[in-house]
């Protein structure tokens, strides 16, 4: 049975990757279908109730700069906002919000339902229809066929998902949801490498059974941060505190005593878990010398008594979970509402993807999110936006696009995955970006919004606000460079008391701001130097661009040097055996990874600069040397 309409783009899955993919495609004018097994769970936060953080907040800002929904929903759902690394340099500062699950889901669903060109339909997908290595549609569990030349799969943990609690296990996509068994079996027939990964979640606790007075209160920041470039603090709901407590030796003894019934340590779980978000039993095993581990007690919302104890993800049996929870200070009488569990699921080797997130072997088939081996809402959302955007571009007959490593954390993410692959759930950190001084949270819009507008992702309202902000920054920088103060100026009376060294020669306002003891707000508050910019984000840009100009220029010079051949394309059908001078090891690695560009090839372990030079000479001789847009 065929559905009565044909679509340009079909998105399978309604999590963070799927919603951003569907919205991006629809914003660009493509007739888009979002298929989900349950409309009520669209935008569901399956694990921790938080958005952002180190590296992750940068991705959220980039999604937002390209017109995505995650940051907007967070501003409406965030019940505690903090700026992490606030005492450090701007490159590593990151916004994190504790989010109300229900409010977040509601806002995402509202955005989806009001998006033109987007149809939502409730059916699980069982089959992928492929003809001559070209995807042509999908078939749902009731045999309904939907036709489309592009399909974006955002299946999360649902592919052959298996949930583990102690030695008990059962099939599931997440707690309370069925797995996608038929689709997983169909995908295993494709010429794409497949593996298994694992993730987990902690038990949820009844807040009424917790003694918060025994814990350390953790309040949000004042003034309140805002996640979206078009958001404001008035959108935030009521703000509340989180709390901090710790495990202890008794907790660790309880965990050690239960390891014989742990699916992780008895060989039942084969999938590899996330290195940077390990289970509590993994922490006890790997860091045996530590007598205590921090636990963040995070509320799941304003209208629920559920608490998420961040730091004790576990798949231990329920009786062990209850005992370990009750051994923790403040939770001696705690009641578990939902047990913690681990989930194993299929993922596909991201080295089999182009940097557009289209598979290299099946035209029109795109993967985004945990199916590519990543972990985290933010990583999923960023991939979803890119995949949905590129599916739409492909339908429109236009060239696909992916930011470079020096343009966005999204570029770093995709390049890492498609070039190096991953054997464990991949999460983003600022340390993964070699050009992080240029890839700050605060300038994500300046980096990406113009490109988003060009691609059709950015609406008129966002574009107007962005251009106004960008113009105000440029005009203010011009003013600071063009206004000067002289040693005999009457303004010295208010200025010199604020300086470590008094003015002895003429200096521009920009020179004054560059001094370490001076900041923009202070300078603008002095009579004769203001009034300055009212928009705090624009003012922050001015300060950063002035104070870090030397470092920024140095990094830009490094990029210009590296980029000379970064985008030189490697033809997909290039036979590396025919390239004279390449070693057998290099040939094997290039055939295994199949890099899209010289830049990707250069980052493969074991590929030497000499091998890159040989490739460039070969491409030039054959007239094959061309670059991406």
UniProtKB/Swiss-Prot annotation:
Keywords: Cytoplasm, FAD, Flavoprotein, NAD, tRNA processing
Binding site for NAD(+): 273-287
GO molecular function annotations of the record: flavin adenine dinucleotide binding
One GO CC term on file: cytosol
Cofactor: FAD
InterPro entries hit by this protein: FAD/NAD-bd_sf, GIDA_C_N, MnmG, MnmG-rel, MnmG-rel_CS, MnmG_C, MnmG_C_subdom, MnmG_C_subdom_sf
Binding site for FAD: 13-18
UniProt subcellular location: Cytoplasm
Protein name stated in the entry: tRNA uridine 5-carboxymethylaminomethyl modification enzyme MnmG
Species per Swiss-Prot/TrEMBL record: Shewanella denitrificans (strain OS217 / ATCC BAA-1090 / DSM 15013)
Gene: mnmG
């Amino acid at each position: 049975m065929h559905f009565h309409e044909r679509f340009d783009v079909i998105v399978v899955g309604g999590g963070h990757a799927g919603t951003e993919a569907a919205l991006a495609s629809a914003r660009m004018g493509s007739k888009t279908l979002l298929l989900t097994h349950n409309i009520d769970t669209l935008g569901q936060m399956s694990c921790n109730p938080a958005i952002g953080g180190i590296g992750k907040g940068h991705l959220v800002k980039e999604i937002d700069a390209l017109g995505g929904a995650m940051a907007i929903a967070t501003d409406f759902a965030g019940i505690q906002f903090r700026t992490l690394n606030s005492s450090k340099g701007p490159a590593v500062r990151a916004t994190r919000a504790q989010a109300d699950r229900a409010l977040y889901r509601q806002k995402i669903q509202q955005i989806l339902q009001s998006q033109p060109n987007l149809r939502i339909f409730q059916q699980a997908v069982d089959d992928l229809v492929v003809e001559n290595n070209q995807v042509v549609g999908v078939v749902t569990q009731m045999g309904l066929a939907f036709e489309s030349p592009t399909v974006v799969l955002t299946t999360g943990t649902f592919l052959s998902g298996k949930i583990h609690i102690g030695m008990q296990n059962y099939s599931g996509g997440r707690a309370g949801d069925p797995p996608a068994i038929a689709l997983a079996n169909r995908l295993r027939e494709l010429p794409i490498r497949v593996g298994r990964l694992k993730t987990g979640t902690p038990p949820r606790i009844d807040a009424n059974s917790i003694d918060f007075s025994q814990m350390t209160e953790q309040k949000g920041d004042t003034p309140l941060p805002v996640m979206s470039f078009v958001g404001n603090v008035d959108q935030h709901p009521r703000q509340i505190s989180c709390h901090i407590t710790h495990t202890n030796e008794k907790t660790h003894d309880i965990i050690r005593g239960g390891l014989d019934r742990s699916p992780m340590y008895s060989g039942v779980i084969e999938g590899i878990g996330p290195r940077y978000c390990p289970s509590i039993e993994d922490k006890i095993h790997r860091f045996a010398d530590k007598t205590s581990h921090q636990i963040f007690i995070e509320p799941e919302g304003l209208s629920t008594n559920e608490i998420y104890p961040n730091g004790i993800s576990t798949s231990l049996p329920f009786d062990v979970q209850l005992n370990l929870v009750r051994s923790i200070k403040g939770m001696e009488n705690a009641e578990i509402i939902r047990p913690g569990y681990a989930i194993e699921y299929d993922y596909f080797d991201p080295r089999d993807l182009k940097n557009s997130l289209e598979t290299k072997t099946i035209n029109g088939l795109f993967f985004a999110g945990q199916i590519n081996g990543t972990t985290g809402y933010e990583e999923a959302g960023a991939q979803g936006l890119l995949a949905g955007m590129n599916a739409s571009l492909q339908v429109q007959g236009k060239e696909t696009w992916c930011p470079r490593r020096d343009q966005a954390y999204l570029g770093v993410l995709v390049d890492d995955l498609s070039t190096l692959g991953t054997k464990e759930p991949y999460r983003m950190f600022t340390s993964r970006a070699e050009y992080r001084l240029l890839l700050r949270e605060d300038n994500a819009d300046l980096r990406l919004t113009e490109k988003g507008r060009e691609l059709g992702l950015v609406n008129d309202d966002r574009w107007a606000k962005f251009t106004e902000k960008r113009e105000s920054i440029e005009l203010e920088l011009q003013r600071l460079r063009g206004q000067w103060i002289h040693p005999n100026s009457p303004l010295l009376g208010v200025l010199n008391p604020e300086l470590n060294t008094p003015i002895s020669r003429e200096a521009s306002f920009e020179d004054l701001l560059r001094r370490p003891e001076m900041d923009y707000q202070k300078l603008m508050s002095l009579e004769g130097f203001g009034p300055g910019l009212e928009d705090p984000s624009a003012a922050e840009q001015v300060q950063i661009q002035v104070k870090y100009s030397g470092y920024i220029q140095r990094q830009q010079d490094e990029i210009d040097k590296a980029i000379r051949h970064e985008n030189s394309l490697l033809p997909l059908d290039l036979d590396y055996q025919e390239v004279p001078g390449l070693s057998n090891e290099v040939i094997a690695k290039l055939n295994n990874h199949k890099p899209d560009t010289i830049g990707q090839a250069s980052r493969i372990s074991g590929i030497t600069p000499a091998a890159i030079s040989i490739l460039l000479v070969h491409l030039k001789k054959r007239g094959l040397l061309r670059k991406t847009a």
